[in-house]
């Protein structure tokens, strides 16, 4: 069911100050702050301070993203955590898709600072199962063919069932191949960190996700040592924060944060 609130009009990062419980919201690969603002606004209404960040190389141009490493994306997320701490007493990190990988790294490396995790459509593995095998070849392709294969255009837009949201989302129209290499490296790095993540975790994923298969849920249930609660959506695709179930997602996240990150039940 579509949300009762209008979709965001701004693509800027924003700190929405409210109560002393806080949420850091981290968007996905080739995404932008817009995809997390709707959730941030709903959390703010629930008296939760929300910091919607923009990752390095995102929300500007594909060329900007091309020169950025995954460590730079993590640096953006870490800076967002630092900023949010100035206004809150406890923090839950909410990451979508690739942002979920960064959230896992934040939790593993900052256990005293991150109270809990919400992973929206996490991208530990993607529907393009051969990508990890192909990624090491990408630098050779770029050297051999130059600009011809520098960017890969997205076909059909973002993986969103809601037509209005799919039309409105201002994500990149093409993906830099160099950035794909960085994504694969981040996936491997995040997978190695899973045994270190002991915070309560809420995983929200759609059974209709065409980008990151529902298999991601099973991986997290098996490999995270801390408590994990899952919610499987039926009407949304990949970008669940703005898709047909966006109000349900917002309510579940707000409840999780307000409970202090309790995942059991």
Label the predicted regions.
Residues 210-216:
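Conserved alpha/beta-hydrolase "acid-adjacent" motif
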Residues 95-99, 103:
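Gly/Ala-rich beta-loop-alpha elbow adjacent to hydrolase catalytic centers
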Residues 197, 203-205, 209:
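Short beta-strand/loop motif that positions the catalytic acidic residue
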Residues 176-193:
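Active-site nucleophile elbow and catalytic-triad environment of alpha/beta-hydrolase enzymes
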């Amino acid at each position: 069911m579509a949300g009762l609130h209008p979709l965001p009009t701004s693509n800027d990062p924003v700190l929405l100050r409210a109560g002393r419980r806080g949420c850091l919201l981290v968007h996905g690969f080739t995404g932008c702050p817009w995809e997390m603002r709707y959730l941030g606004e709903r959390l703010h209404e629930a008296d939760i301070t929300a910091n919607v960040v923009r990752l390095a190389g995102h929300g500007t141009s594909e060329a900007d993203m091309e020169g950025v490493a995954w460590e730079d994306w993590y640096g953006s997320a870490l800076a967002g955590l630092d900023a949010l701490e100035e206004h809150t007493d406890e923090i839950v990190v909410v990451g979508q898709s690739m942002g979920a990988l960064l959230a896992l790294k934040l939790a593993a490396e900052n256990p005293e600072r991150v109270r809990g995790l919400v992973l929206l459509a996490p991208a530990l593995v993607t529907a393009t199962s051969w990508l990890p095998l192909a990624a090491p070849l990408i630098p050779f392709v770029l050297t051999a063919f130059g600009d011809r294969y520098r960017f890969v255009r997205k076909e059909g837009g973002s993986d969103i069932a809601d037509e209005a949201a799919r039309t409105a989302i201002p994500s990149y129209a093409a993906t830099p191949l160099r950035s794909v290499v960085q994504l694969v490296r981040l996936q491997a790095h995040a997978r190695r960190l899973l045994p270190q993540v002991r915070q309560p975790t809420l995983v929200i994923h759609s059974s209709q996700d065409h980008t990151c298969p529902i298999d991601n849920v099973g991986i997290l249930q098996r490999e995270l040592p801390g408590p994990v609660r899952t919610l499987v959506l039926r009407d949304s695709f990949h970008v669940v924060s703005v898709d047909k179930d966006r109000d349900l997602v917002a309510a579940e996240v707000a409840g999780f944060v307000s409970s202090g990150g309790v995942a059991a039940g």
